[in-house]
Amino acid sequence: MRNTRKYGNKKVRYQGAVYDSRKEARRAAELSLLEKAGKISNVQTQVKFVLIPSQREPDTVGKRGGIKQGKVIEKECAYYADFVYKDDKGRWIVEDTKGFRTKDYIIKRKLMLYVHGIKITEI
């Protein structure tokens, strides 16, 4: 039985980094050239944005009098942007290289706009 990925994409290595698809690796190469040309700056990959913080039980006082943090009831919900960079006008751009738009992605895209006021650019 062959181990295949759900949407048929293959991990690709480019300049020492591993990307989730050929399309994402090609975009990384394009952004690298744009950065070298001075058109963009501060290119970052896999930047985490917390959409909903983790939910915890209330803190309690421990046996020795210290504050004991409550245990996690629900883990945080986070979005990882494929690329974040500054354009030539000084604006921050958040990009996602999309092949197939899953329901989870669509919800996270809407939460990014609602929580952080950031519109994701889809490539």
Q: Where in this protein do the model-derived segments appear?
A:
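Electrostatic, structured charged patches in enzyme active sites and in nucleic-acid/phosphate-binding
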Residues: M1-I123
